[in-house]
Design a protein with these regions (language model features):
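Serine-esterase "nucleophile elbow" of acetyl-processing enzymes
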Residues: 1-38
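Hydrophobic, aromatic-enriched interface-forming segments
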Residues: 121-174
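The substrate-binding groove and active-site-proximal loops of carbohydrate-active enzymes
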Residues: 116-128, 189, 241-244
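Short amphipathic alpha-helices and their capping/turn segments at secondary-structure boundaries
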Residues: 46-68, 132-147, 207
Length: 279
């Protein structure tokens, strides 16, 4: 069974690339995709707001799935990065509730691109993601799929650029980095910093076998992708728009993830036996 954000959605707006559809295994396999064709999940907390998914995950009458595939966390990071420094009434948004710092809050240049980043805001977001993923684990373990592997992927590093989706959404990072006056030369590095923070968090959760049993995280940041050209507004590199992959990008990540999933479900392929020397 699968559930998640736009990287799993089969909506027409995502026809350019769907990570789930690019998965390929040696044995026949099928997944019930709860992300469906309509609005995919915007935030990880919305998973529980999808009653059919919750029923299929944890109800005693649900099937026992071989595994659960999740695409979660990316939109939460994007939303946190989009949080402005001030509300419409002029009041300041505290650092604990946003990921970017105003120019007067920047650290010293010696801090690198980390000087633009709100660590207090990241702590808030990490606690939120940790709590909700732990809740998903508990839902799984209430039903017939208790102890079955739950597979989560990390994301890839997008180039902040003026590339919106066909349905008018976006761009996502580009306007906020401009609003926070982050130098354009540092945009990609700031994007990488946020994606890597999420990847490190997800991997740390998977390493906590007591609180997050049978959680398997695939580090998609290690898959080489063609970065979009700075300033481009359309398809570029392995990207369809600012934050969504095209078919080639989805293909590259999905093929590597397929192997990682298969290694858990059926075990790694046997190592070749070295031929002995003849007498």
């Amino acid at each position: 069974m699968a559930q998640g954000d736009s990287w799993f959605s089969t909506a027409a707006a995502q026809a350019h690339g769907n990570l789930l559809q690019e998965l390929m295994f040696k044995q026949p396999a099928a997944a019930l995709n709860c992300a469906g064709r309509g609005e995919s999940l915007s935030h990880v907390v919305d998973l529980e707001a999808a009653p059919e998914f919750v029923r299929l995950l944890g109800d005693t009458s649900a099937p026992a799935w071989d595994g659960i595939l999740l695409s979660v966390g990316g939109n939460d990071v994007i939303a946190a990065a989009q949080t402005p420094a001030h509300l419409p009434d002029g009041s300041e948004v505290p650092l604990e509730k946003r990921l970017l710092r105003r120019q007067t809050e920047w650290g010293p240049p010696s801090a690198g691109v980390g000087r633009y980043f709100s660590e207090p805001g990241w702590t808030t977001l990490a606690d939120y993601l940790r709590t909700n993923l732990r809740h998903l684990i508990s839902l799984r373990d209430q039903g017939p799929s208790a102890g079955k592997p739950m597979f989560v992927h990390c994301y890839a590093v997008p180039m902040p650029r003026p590339a919106a989706a066909e349905d008018g959404r976006g761009p996502w990072l580009y306007p906020m980095l401009k609003a926070y006056a982050v130098p354009s030369a540092d945009w990609l590095a700031v994007s990488r910093l946020m994606v890597m923070h999420l990847a490190q968090l997800l991997k740390s959760l998977a390493a906590d076998k007591e609180q997050f049993p049978h959680l398997h995280v695939f580090d998609s940041t290690s898959v080489p992708l063609a970065t979009a050209t700075p300033g481009s507004s359309g398809v570029s590199g392995d990207w369809h728009n600012e934050i969504h992959l095209n078919h080639s990008g989805s293909f590259k990540i999905a093929r590597a993830w397929s192997e990682a999933i298969e290694n858990v479900l059926v075990g790694p392929p046997p190592k070749p036996v070295k031929a002995g020397k003849g007498r």
